[in-house]
Regions:
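Acidic catalytic loop of the alpha/beta-hydrolase fold
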Residues: 221-225
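Gly/Ala-rich beta-loop-alpha elbow adjacent to hydrolase catalytic centers
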Residues: 100, 104, 108
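Conserved HGGG/HGGXW glycine-rich cap/lid loop of the alpha/beta-hydrolase fold
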Residues: 15-69
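Catalytic histidine-centered segment of alpha/beta-hydrolase-like enzymes
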Residues: 247-260
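Short beta-strand/loop motif that positions the catalytic acidic residue
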Residues: 210, 216-218
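Active-site loop/oxyanion-hole signature of alpha/beta-hydrolase fold enzymes
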Residues: 59-99
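Conserved alpha/beta-hydrolase catalytic His-Asp/Glu region
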Residues: 153-206
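Flexible "cap/lid" loop of the alpha/beta hydrolase fold
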Residues: 109, 113, 119-149
């Protein structure tokens, strides 16, 4: 059995990080998951459960979120990627496959381009190119600048249909239950640090330089990151393919049974 998950805290450059590792099988490249804004590593548990048990899975809470304490000072994507590289070294990994969702997709792009030795293959889910992208509506963006949805379940149930799209339109209670049962929100300042980390950042200039095999995944009903962004990234990244699923921004969680095999097939391909 490969299902046991080890959760522990490690120190990387003076920063404590909460890390979870699900052991896999030798011969397969481990998979690093980078989560979206405000969400702890626990949120992606449904996706991890659907992945082939042979895949070793690494998750972590970014500083100031979940079980990782606030950093001493704010950070940018460059500093966070250095921290991720240090975390991988501390855990004994040289190279991994990388999956980033939403905000974490921006971090994953930065890591793959500027620390290429760390990334073998790249999976970008429900994400975009940063400051220069096809934006969400102003009403959606206004709801994203605050962590209130993680703190107030009734508020989340009310806004989930318009914020996340997909199955959240018909079953917002399921989304609320998932996020409030397994997400551990850090301080409000930690959420703001995440917002600030990507302010002004864009991957548009360097995506044509990305030489990693890349799978771009997007839902056809994602109010936060419109599908046009996935099509743009697929066009810009030389060795990429696009997978469009029927669902919304949280498809990796709500449609995990469909999407996990797609990811696994891409990572296992020759």
């Amino acid at each position: 059995m490969f299902s046991t998950v080890e959760v522990r805290s490690i120190a990387v450059g003076g920063q404590q990080l909460r890390v979870a590792v699900r052991p896999g099988r030798r011969g397969r490249v481990p998979l690093l998951l980078i989560n979206g804004i405000g969400a702890s590593l626990d949120l992606l548990q449904p996706f991890v459960d659907e992945l082939a048990p042979s895949v070793e899975v690494i998750r972590f809470d970014v500083p100031g979120v979940g079980g990782s304490p606030l950093p001493v000072v704010p950070y940018r994507f460059t500093g966070l990627c250095r921290m991720i590289s240090g975390m991988l070294s501390e855990l004994g990994y040289a190279s991994v496959d990388v999956l980033g969702i939403s905000w974490g997709g921006g971090v994953a792009q930065h890591l793959a381009v500027f620390q290429p030795s760390r990334c073998r293959r790249l999976v970008l889910v429900s994400t975009g190119t940063g400051a220069l992208m096809v934006p969400a509506s102003p009403a959606i963006l206004a709801r994203m600048i605050t962590p209130r949805r993680y703190l107030d379940r009734r508020y989340l149930e009310r806004i989930a249909p318009i914020l996340y799209g997909g199955s959240a339109r018909t079953d917002p209670q399921r989304v609320a239950s998932t996020m409030h049962d397994v997400s551990r929100l850090g301080s409000g300042r930690g959420y703001l640090y995440q917002l600030a980390a990507g302010t002004g950042w864009t991957s548009l200039p360097f995506l044509p330089l990305l030489r990693k095999p890349t799978l771009v995944m997007s839902g056809d009903d994602d109010p936060i990151i419109p599908l046009a962004n996935a099509r743009l990234m697929n066009w810009l990244i030389p060795d990429s393919r696009l997978y469009v699923y029927h669902g919304g921004h949280l498809g990796l969680v709500t449609e995990a049974a469909e999407l996990a095999p797609v990811v696994d097939s891409f990572l296992a391909a020759p």
